[in-house]
Amino acid sequence: MARILAFDFGTKRIGIASTDPMQIIANALDTVHPKDVVVYLKKYLNTEPVEAFVVGLPRTLQNEESSNAANVKAFINLIKKNFPQTPIYGVDERFTSSMAFDTMLAGGVSKKGRRDKATIDKISATIILQSFMEQKQNGTATMIFKPDDANS
């Protein structure tokens, strides 16, 4: 099986998480600057097969698009353009940053460590990926780009 990659998009950093090859476990992978993400992914895909991408979709508590939605859409379009054969799924990312912080707190991470935004972004991406894996298993995953749509 191929891996699945998930992204927690931010204008300063993109948190990235990956499944294991059997798609059982979600692991924090890395953080990259948005301008470096395509090069990073091309290198990664040269060494690891990837079945799908998952992008955290920013929503407000009222279930409306957040102020970062336009940036995330631009990121999705960048991925579509550069990796047109890879499907993209969307997952509601509300509360992932606070869940990541709580995870760090429960894990005994020091106060200094909890201030590391790159770590929070990686953990947020992992939470997004775990949510997707649950949705995929119960048939509720939302595909936002199919490779067949590449020519649309």
UniProtKB/Swiss-Prot annotation:
It comes from the Bacteria. GO terms for molecular function: nuclease activity. Its main location: cytoplasm. Its EC number is 3.1.-.-. Keywords: Cytoplasm, Hydrolase, Nuclease, Ribosome biogenesis. It is found in: Cytoplasm. One of its GO terms (cellular component) is cytosol. It is an enzyme of class 3 (hydrolase). GO terms for biological process: rRNA 5'-end processing. Belongs to the YqgF nuclease family. Could be a nuclease involved in processing of the 5'-end of pre-16S rRNA. This is Putative pre-16S rRNA nuclease. It comes from Cytophaga hutchinsonii (strain ATCC 33406 / DSM 1761 / CIP 103989 / NBRC 15051 / NCIMB 9469 / D465).
